[in-house]
Structure formats: structure tokens, C-alpha cells
């Protein structure tokens, strides 16, 4: 497998990213991996490698680059660390991530290992909002977007991602935990209602008995069967839309 740490120039600075793809010349269909709130780490790089082994070029950006190098030792997580994670999460928003996505698309367009044209993406936790937003902002590029236990997809703010779904041309996949304090009870019905007014092909699943984070193998709430089902669902969508 080919893998490398790269730097993508954005409107706001230099954004480090990890990339992985199969050995060989390619080109390979691209997947953007938007991180969860605790940030870029080896656990996510291993997940990016899994995507690459399936025949994709995966790019995992460090979305906290504006803050410098931010790393969290999650096994030693404390209340103070959680507060810093929340502050880091709040340092970015839909517009900033849209800017970063534009930069990544340009970077990939200039990379010979990346297949030109349609792009897939996945976002965990805080990035559920972002995969929805970028699918609307780049409707002719983002053709297959997945969200796992995504938060802030439906809010009362004017930039709430669910208000943009009528602009999406690609396919959407949302996997929610049954128990998730970050997803109030109105979110899934409101998201379903917004999508029902469009022609967007979408799948919304709620995985019984799961908690937020159920697809992260290093979390206490990891659920193998549900996690593997999300992988199967995502690969089926990406293969259908990108290969």
C-alpha cells in the first residue's frame, strides 16, 4: 500500500493530511475522510487504510490545523481534555470546512494517483454536518457521502446542513446510534422530512443497542456487528457510485 503524509494549501494555511491508496499507478476513486472531534490519530489512519485496501485513494485531513498541532491521548481522557476537544471542535464550522474541501479537491485534481471526477466522503461524529454541507456545496463532485453518528446535521441555525439537502445531487447514507446524547430526538425525523421533499437518494439507519462511537474499534462502545455493517453499506454505495 502507498501511504504518505502530505500538506494541502488552503485559504487559511497549510493543512496536514494522511493519504493512502493501493500500490500501483492507479488512478483510484477518491474518498475524503472527515474526522471526529478527537481529531486525526492512528485509529483513523487505520480506517483510512481500510478504505484504501478496498481500491480507493483516501485522504484524511487534520481539520484542526488552524490551531497548530492538536493531539489527544484518548485512553487518558479527563474532563479537562474533553473541554479542549469541545473547544477544538467549535473552532471550525461549515464555511471553513467548505473552504478546506475546495482545497482538497484542487489538490486531488493535480495528483496522478487520484481518478478525476466524482468524489466520495465519510464523516464521523462532528463531521456528519460537514459531509452534508459539502455534498450541497459541491453537488457535481460529491456523489456518495456517508455520516456515522453525525451531530449538528439539524440545528436551529441558518446554516443548518439539513436546509441544504435540496441542492444535493449525490447519494447520502446516515448511520445513527440508538443512544446518542448528541442527536436530539427531533433530528432524525426532521432530516427524513427534509430529504422527503427532494429526489436525493438516501438511506437512514438506526443501529439498535448502540452508543455514539460504536464504529470505532478502540472505543469501549465498539459494536463489531453494527460497525461491520456500516463498512459494508459504505463500500456498496461507493462502489456503485464511484467505480
Question: Where are the language model's segments positioned?
Answer:
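N-terminal cap/leader regions of alpha/beta-hydrolase-fold enzymes
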Residues: 1-243
Amino acid at each position: 500500500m502507498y501511504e504518505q503524509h502530505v500538506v494541502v494549501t488552503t485559504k487559511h494555511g497549510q493543512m496536514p493530511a494522511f493519504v493512502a491508496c493501493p500500490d500501483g499507478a492507479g488512478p483510484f476513486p477518491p474518498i475524503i475522510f472527515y474526522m471526529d472531534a478527537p481529531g486525526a490519530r492512528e485509529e483513523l489512519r487505520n480506517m483510512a487504510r481500510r478504505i484504501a485496501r478496498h481500491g480507493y485513494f483516501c485522504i484524511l485531513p487534520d481539520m484542526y490545523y488552524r490551531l497548530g498541532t492538536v493531539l489527544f491521548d484518548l485512553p487518558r481522557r479527563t474532563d479537562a481534555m474533553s473541554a479542549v476537544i469541545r473547544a477544538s471542535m467549535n473552532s471550525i464550522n461549515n464555511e471553513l470546512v467548505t473552504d478546506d474541501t475546495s482545497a482538497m479537491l484542487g489538490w486531488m485534481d493535480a495528483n496522478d494517483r487520484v481518478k478525476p471526477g466524482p468524489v466520495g466522503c465519510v464523516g464521523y461524529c462532528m463531521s456528519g454536518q460537514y459531509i452534508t454541507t459539502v455534498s450541497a456545496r459541491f453537488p457535481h463532485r460529491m456523489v456518495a457521502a456517508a455520516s456515522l453518528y453525525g451531530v449538528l446535521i439539524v440545528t436551529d441555525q441558518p446554516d443548518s446542513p439539513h436546509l441544504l439537502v435540496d441542492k444535493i445531487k449525490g447519494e447520502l447514507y446516515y448511520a445513527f446510534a440508538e443512544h446518542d446524547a448528541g442527536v436530539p430526538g427531533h433530528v432524525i425525523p426532521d432530516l427524513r422530512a427534509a430529504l422527503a421533499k427532494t429526489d436525493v437518494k438516501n438511506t437512514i439507519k438506526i443501529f439498535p443497542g448502540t452508543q455514539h462511537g460504536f464504529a470505532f474499534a478502540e472505543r469501549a462502545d465498539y459494536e463489531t456487528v453494527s460497525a461491520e455493517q456500516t463498512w459494508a453499506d459504505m463500500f456498496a454505495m461507493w462502489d456503485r457510485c464511484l467505480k
